[in-house]
Amino acid sequence: MNIKWLGHSAFHIETAKAKILIDPFFTGNPAFRDEERKAATAGLTHILLTHGHGDHVGDTVAIAKETGATVLANFDLCMWLGRQGISKLEPGNTGGTIQLGSFTATFVNALHSSAQITDDGVSHSLGNANGLVLHFDDEPTLYHMGDTEIFSDMALVQELHEPEIGIVPIGDRFTMGGAVAALACQRYFKFNTTIPCHYGSFPIIDQTPETFIAGMDGASTLVATPEVGGAVTL
């Protein structure tokens, strides 16, 4: 498995049988490097969305039309995407598991909002924000938390799914900050590898993972902090 960070919460995950984008926020992402786009979309099989905010939906519509990739998201967000001309959709909701060829995706809780703001300035709710747990045939189980605060039912995510890889938001203001994210990882999970995200993009969120790294001192997990465009191979 190759996991490439594309800035903010965007990741490209490649296995022997799938090429996946999670939350492909490219256009307008201060951290994204345009030269990464071609490789990130080549041969793409799936786009997975944690929630409906623009910095997570990102370029989904354009990429889905360009590649024909299947898009998985919560039901309300899928209905909105359908109105944008996307037909290969896999709608679900919290607690549901969907088979996507060589892997499954399970919607789990996240404490956050999910909406799009139209040109008139009105915010329209697009279902629940979620984390996503991905179970693969022959690869480690991965948990992308989406945008969230710490919550005690993270213990159930560990009990039910036993994720080996955790992708964790740490940037503060819109998600938990680094110290709280480290507490969540240390208290509730037994990750082999932990990858922080949702930092170093917009100036109003934390710019480095240092607080998170300090909070993970003594943990048995590997904390991987690739540069944007860098990858972790497992």
From Swiss-Prot:
The keyword Cytoplasm does not apply. The keyword Hydrolase applies. Keywords: Hydrolase. GO terms for molecular function: hydrolase activity. It comes from the Bacteria. Belongs to the UPF0173 family. HAMAP family: UPF0173. This is UPF0173 metal-dependent hydrolase R01310. It comes from Rhizobium meliloti (strain 1021) (Ensifer meliloti).
